[in-house]
């Protein structure tokens, strides 16, 4: 996996090749049954209309809210843009929402390029530090492993 992290306080860019078509990647990003297997056990659901909501929840009864956001743009299976506000820590929840952009490009031989940009982090320095560590790397490694092997990373 290729990772580029620039200006940690404002923009983080991650790129990786996944042996899967864009439709498979899109489904894995947007469907709670998939996200639960690689996104720290959270079930992430999207209302894929502009202004729609993003909710990531955990727990047997799904009562633990982890992340919330608003869908800004959805162009299946190529691009998804949404805001991001972490709720699992009171300090993070008190910060301004940031933005996450997922872009999926079809490549050759069944391989696609996934680019994830987490930006607008100027008002969310603790979030920036939190996701720059193992955060996005773990999530994206888990996504790649799941799609390529059919099994979760851990």
Q: What does each model-identified segment do?
A:
Residues 145-154:
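Short, highly charged C-terminal tails/helix-capping segments
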Residues 75-80, 109:
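Short, conserved beta-turn/loop elements at beta-strand boundaries and strand-helix junctions
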Residues 16, 67-73, 98-106:
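Hydrophobic/aromatic beta-strand elements that line small-molecule binding cavities or substrate pockets
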